[in-house]
């Protein structure tokens, strides 16, 4: 009897879908955006997932003048979606397109359920130091680049209800094994995508270059494609908060991320 052969990408997709199902089993989730309808064309549909951070009852960081991270991330994500769909042969799927509370695991599931080529999570930074400023871009690694990055990942991850933490140690071990497999396949592409987006943010906007970093952001875990998390600027810095709330500046942020993505796709063309 002939043995069936599966590609590494098929295996990673299957493993990631199993992970997403394991993490969300038994927990009622929010109504997600529908999966893409591919019936209208015989050509393969290529999807980019944009993830506006936070939402709903989880506003994220809040600025001195009342600007909310969840509003900034959605505004920039919508502008980025429009740019990509206007200039690239990709369909863009948002993990949320309104003020919704979407779990971190469900955001990853949106990427895997739609066979994403790229996953970009958009955030605005916060700090107890109001003078902290600049942009930084992250890709997934279980070991954080430094202590400050480890603390940031912890704050982003524990934004979820604490009761959702995994209690079953065996399930937790499976989660890390599956992610290590996905990480091995996509870490190089994720790093290059992070580098290019970070370079264009700094080049266009003159932001302090806080560099690219690695950390165990929960929203990136289990995503079976190149994945990054972008911290646009510090909403806790009054000067940067004013900029983040300005629609023209949001457009410039979206254009900068778009340019980095274009350069990445030239380096790693999608089949």
PLM regions: where:
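Basic/polar, cationic surfaces and motifs that engage anionic cell-wall
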Residues: 3, 27, 271
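Short, basic/glycine-rich phosphate-binding loops at helix/coil junctions
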Residues: 173-177
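General N-terminal leader/first-domain-start detector
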Residues: 1-3, 113
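N-terminal and secondary-structure boundary signal
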Residues: 2, 9, 21-22, 37-38
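N-terminal export leaders
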Residues: 6-16
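Active-site-adjacent mobile loop/cap segments within catalytic or ligand-binding domains
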Residues: 178-271
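Catalytic-core regions of hydrolytic enzymes
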Residues: 30-171, 184-195, 199, 255
């Amino acid at each position: 009897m002939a043995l069936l052969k599966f590609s590494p990408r098929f295996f990673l997709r299957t493993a990631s879908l199993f992970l997403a199902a394991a993490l969300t089993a038994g927990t009622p989730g929010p109504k997600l955006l529908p999966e893409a309808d591919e019936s209208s064309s015989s050509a393969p549909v290529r999807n980019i997932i944009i993830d506006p951070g936070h939402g709903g009852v989880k506003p994220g960081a809040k600025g001195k003048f009342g600007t909310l991270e969840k509003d900034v991330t959605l505004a920039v994500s919508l502008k980025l979606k429009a740019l990509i769909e206007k200039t690239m042969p990709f369909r863009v799927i948002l993990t949320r397109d309104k003020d919704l509370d979407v779990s971190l695991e469900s955001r990853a599931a949106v990427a895997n359920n739609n066979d994403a080529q790229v996953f970009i999570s958009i955030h605005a930074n916060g700090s107890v130091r109001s003078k902290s400023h600049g942009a930084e871009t992250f890709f997934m690694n279980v070991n954080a680049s430094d202590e400050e990055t480890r603390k940031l990942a912890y704050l982003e991850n524990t934004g979820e209800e604490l009761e959702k933490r995994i209690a079953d140690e065996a399930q937790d071990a499976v989660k890390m094994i599956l992610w290590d497999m996905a990480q091995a396949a996509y870490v190089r592409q994720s790093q290059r995508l992070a580098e290019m987006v970070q370079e264009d943010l700094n080049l266009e906007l003159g932001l302090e270059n806080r560099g690219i970093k690695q950390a165990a952001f929960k929203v990136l875990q289990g995503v079976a494609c190149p994945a990054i998390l972008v911290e646009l600027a510090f909403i806790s810095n009054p000067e940067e908060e004013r900029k983040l709330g300005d629609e023209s500046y949001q457009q410039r942020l979206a254009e900068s991320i778009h340019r980095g993505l274009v350069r990445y796709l030239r380096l790693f063309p999608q089949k």
